[in-house]
């Protein structure tokens, strides 16, 4: 009984979730808690619903790189409290 495995399980559970910040161009920051192996599309859709935006209107980037809907925090080596940047999709060109 010396090996108390539930304690290990608790640690794993804590490490399984990650807190991410999503920073908009207007300076707003929205926090999300997501599992490391959950596709980021879930976070992206939740952010859009919360902000009243369409997925087609904005782009998500992490460390300057575009994020695909199928990417997971684990694949992108995200750590707790990392920030995802949101940019408005640029349309058109010269006035």
Curated annotation (Swiss-Prot):
Q: Which Pfam families would you find in this protein's record?
A: Rad60-SLD
* Mutagenesis or variant effect for residue 33 to E: Significantly impairs sumoylation of MTA1
Tell me which residues bear N6-acetyllysine.
Answer: 11
Q: At which residues is the cross-link Glycyl lysine isopeptide (Lys-Gly) (interchain with G-Cter in SUMO) found?
A: 11
Q: InterPro entries, alphabetically?
A: Rad60/SUMO-like_dom, Ubiquitin-like_dom, Ubiquitin-like_domsf
- GO cellular component annotations of the record: GABA-ergic synapse; glutamatergic synapse; hippocampal mossy fiber to CA3 synapse; nucleoplasm; nucleus; PML body; postsynaptic cytosol; presynaptic cytosol
Q: Glycyl lysine isopeptide (Lys-Gly) (interchain with G-Cter in ubiquitin) cross-link position in this chain?
A: 11
Q: Sorted alphabetically, which keywords does the UniProt record give?
A: Acetylation, Host-virus interaction, Isopeptide bond, Nucleus, Ubl conjugation, Ubl conjugation pathway
MF (Gene Ontology):
protein tag activity; RNA binding; SUMO transferase activity; ubiquitin protein ligase binding; ubiquitin-like protein ligase binding
User: Where is the cross-link described as Glycyl lysine isopeptide (Gly-Lys) (interchain with K-? in acceptor proteins)?
Assistant: 93
Outcome following mutation: residue 11 to R: Abolishes the formation of poly(SUMO) chains
- For the cross-link Glycyl lysine isopeptide (Lys-Gly) (interchain with G-Cter in SUMO2), list the residue numbers: 5, 7, 11, 21
Residue ranges annotated as propeptide in the record: 94-95
Q: In which tissues is it expressed?
A: Broadly expressed.
Q: Where in the cell is it found?
A: Nucleus; Nucleus, PML body
Q: What do we know about how this protein assembles, alone or with others?
A: Interacts with SAE2 and UBE2I. Interacts with ZNF451. Identified in a complex with ZNF451 and UBE2I/UBC9, where one ZNF451 interacts with one UBE2I/UBC9 and two SUMO2 chains, one bound to the UBE2I/UBC9 active site and the other to another region of the same UBE2I/UBC9 molecule. Covalently attached to a number of proteins. Interacts with PELP1. Interacts with USP25; the interaction sumoylates USP25. Interacts with SIMC1, CASP8AP2, RNF111 and SOBP (via SIM domains). Interacts with MTA1. Interacts with HINT1. (Microbial infection) Interacts with Epstein-barr virus BGLF4.
The identity of this protein, by name, is Small ubiquitin-related modifier 2
